[in-house]
Amino acid sequence: MATARASADGVHNAPETVRQSDDKKDITQVERVLSVGDEKGEHADYNRIDQEVAKYAGASEVFVSEEENKRLKKMIDRRVLPIMVITYFLQSLDKGTMSATSIMGIRDDVPGLLSKETFGWLTTCIYLAVLVVEYPTNWILQRVPVAKYLGFNILAWSTVLACHALCFSFPALVAVRTLLGIFEAVCQPAFLIMTGLWYKREEQAQIVTYWYMMNGAQQIVGGLLAYAFSTIRHPSFKANPGNAPIRSWQAIFICYGCISFLWGLYVIFTLPDSPMRAKCWSEEDKKLMVERVRSNQTGLQNKKFRAYQFKEALLDPQTYCYMGIQIFTTLPTSGLGAFYNIIIQDLGFDVLQVQLLAMVLGVVIIATLMGSAWMVKKTKQNLLTMAVFMIPAFTGTIVIMTVKNTNNATKAGLLISYWIIFTFWAAQGLGMSMLTRNVGGQTKKSVCITMNFFAWCAGNAIGPKVFFDGDPRYLKSLSIHLGCYSALLCVIAFLRFNLMLRNKKKDREFGKEISNAHGFDDLTDKENPNFRYVY
């Protein structure tokens, strides 16, 4: 009875704004025979469900066996997951190419790039562009076929990337980098939406980790490829001139652009837009794929804008906590990433050694993200896991700030310390997966994702700008990073306390039994009595 009472309360005791919104009935109604449990309030409210979802969602929860769940997940893993992973890999590779080319002669060929502050703008302008287009991108993603829109943007950014090879002035590079940011802005929001569309709540942390750890994979593969391209020596290459007809940095931009363009075509013709539109599977399988994510309690898709959800997103403290997690992790990440090769070269390594050492950073990032996902799976503790992975970041930063590079031993120690700083990447990945699992209501989720990536962009844009000329040991930059780590720990502590209180309040008011009948009703996490937060 607790379940029935919770479900009924969730529908009948919704905020006044919800009732007023629902009084305006849709012109087209979905006609269905309601289940036996309807009088108990354990059936879906079809006035609130997206009509495309309603064609496949049962009036009440449909049981999907464990065997069926595994079979369906394997089907999704074979079709959707590889595309997400490879797309994110290519996006990370394309975006990170400027760091690889920073020691391949581009700073000598383009006037003004020898200044660290000027060079930093080539990363900053990408994220300023993403910042401007983030909300329009999220708005579009809620209303168009996700796969087709993603594929179009891949084609666009790959073309822009290849055009980098034609740029021999700072304004030209800023222009193409800005366009690159505009078209790549679709990637993470699209993948967060797709993760929620295709995967159950308990699967999402691992899925986000799979595609997000491609940041590390691109360091490994990118390091190898950059090493290979560094052997191309044009007569203009001051460090070691040769007789190649093309500069190494031009070759890498053209090659990566062509590969990404071909991949964009594959995505357009292969990736399903949603479980409801997947032509590659039977109608019965599509119904089961929809039903298996009902328990997420976050909805599937809904094109209707609900003003009260917009307001709730702006007033919800967890929105700003997720923003804090992003800005306090991306600010250090973007700066360290943009100047990675330059920092390692300053330790006394040559160009080819630096390109190979970039691979180790990739291993650290992958190990961090996989390790944090494994720890969450075993302990069910997302925020405590974030805090644990902050310890090496503090340690590595303090060592670099206090130890001078005087011999081979300190050189090796500083290199290792630099690598372990990147363990704070765990907070980025877990923060994004928590957002997809803890925010209900499509309008609210869209606003939260947009604001989350505003913070992500702001951190990435500011990060390279805290590296100053005349600061050879980067003491000012690293001091700012320590401040970010400290602020992040405060955010983690507050968010954990806040979410624990919310769950206890719902347990007291509605009981601990949970019904999934209203999982597609486009209710927010606050108004849905069956919703419980993960922390």
Where are these regions (language model features)?
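Intracellular terminal tails of multi-pass secondary transporters
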Residues: 1-90, 268-299, 303, 445, ...
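Extracytoplasmic gate region of multi-pass secondary transporters
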Residues: 99-100, 308-373, 432, 460, ...
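Extracellular/periplasmic helix-loop-helix junction of adjacent transmembrane segments
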Residues: 99-132
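Central cavity-lining transmembrane alpha-helices of secondary-active solute carriers
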Residues: 123-138, 359-371
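Conserved MFS/SLC helix-loop-helix module at the cytosolic interface between two early adjacent transmembrane helices
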Residues: 131-171
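Short hydrophobic/alpha-helical segments at membrane-entry points of transmembrane helices
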Residues: 169-177, 321-322, 409-417
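Glycine-rich segments within core transmembrane alpha-helices of 12-TM secondary carriers
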Residues: 205-238, 244-248, 254, 259-260, ...
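C-terminal transmembrane helical hairpin of 12-TM major facilitator-type secondary transporters
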Residues: 382-431
